Amino acid sequence: RRAHTLHRAARVVRERHGGRIPGDPEALRRLPGVGRYTAGAIASIAFGLPEPAVDGNVRRVLSRLHDLPDPGAAELRRLAAELVPAERPGDFNQALMELGATVCTPRSPRCDRCPIASYCRARAAGTQAERPRPKPSKAIPEDDVGTAIVLAPDGALLLVRRPEDGLLGGLWEFPGEVVAAGEMP
């Protein structure tokens, strides 16, 4: 799916932007598959614009820095935007992402190696291991599926294409259906 989306975005860049990736964060966000994080990362790293790039690592760093148990996306973007400097914003965003990936890790944060530990409210409160509060796990659905393997006399197999907008969108599979509880396939 990412490859399809990337291809669609490349087509839009070619057709609407003369083959040049737009530098405006809002124009970037209008590209297929480009959300706030990707637009902020591209704008700051490639174009030097002071835009926040909040990924999971940055979320964790900011949650701990401000000792926030469950910050919302808008609050995190606001906090990140306040920190991003006008000079070298891409380097700053990359450093914050790297800090979250290597030092301020989800489990066993290495506060003794953190360059911003003296500013960290969660460390001061002893709550760094609890920040941000983990999201509850999603229940994984379990379905029984009846599948048919249809072989033609010439050895060809019957395959059907999955819907574009679902799980494994656009890929091919043997024909089948979810079987209701108690039914035989």
Regions found by a protein language model. Name each.
Residues 1-130, 183:
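Catalytic cores of DNA base-excision repair glycosylases
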Residues 98-185:
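Intrinsically disordered, low-complexity, charged terminal extensions of DNA damage-control enzymes
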